[in-house]
Amino acid sequence: MVCTEPIISADCHIDLIWLPPALFTENARASLKDRMPFVTDGKDGPIWVSRNGAFFGLQNGMGSAGRKYVPGEIHRSDRMAAQGLYEDGKKGIRRLTDPQLRIKDQDLDGVRGEVLYGILGAAARLEDPVAASEMMRIYNEWLADFCAHCPGRFAGIASIPGHDMGSALSELERVAKRGVVKGVEIPSTTDSKPLYHDDWTHLWSAASDAGLPVHFHTIGGPKPDFESMAPQESRKAFAVFITGFQLHMAQKLMELIYGGLLE
């Protein structure tokens, strides 16, 4: 049976490693420029790093972690490589973050539009909450400009800080006023306050007033230290971790339901 309905890809991503290399350093406030991610030389090519020691991966690399592409390791990446994605990336052709080139790749896959999640994971790896908030502001501005090129094909989800409710509210209100984005994503970290906590109340109200759906993206549970394990134990632990990766969101759903947020 052939599907004749338009395909909307509801879980797509913009990864930091495919963003313009000077995006954050050029657009950050003067007091925070030295704390922003930037691109420098690495042994396998240009890499994204920060001065406090955070590592984000190879520029235009594979997946959100910016890994080096290894043929035969991940079938989805093999398909992307077959279309020249990673070779183009080495040449500085950012197909994933150039709106016209991304639309061409959508057409190649028969996709009519994408919901685009952002850089919350990378912001957490920065381990600098104030700088991460600035990083998200810059990204959200870039995202709005990106989606504005073809709003019928891109539904951008703004990244919202989760470490401080004042920062979260401020950025939510800013992106709502800015327009273009279609929703906001709140961090779903294991150490954040449960969603039924009163601290979240103002955020829910602000999102509702702005007409912006609130999104959560799974990050899985606590990650085991695979490198400290024997090879077979590591394989088993990884299989358990990756199989249960999506189940972590059941906790968030229960917090929403029993917090009365859906009533």
Residue ranges with predicted function:
Residues 1-263:
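Helix-coil boundary/capping segments in enzymes
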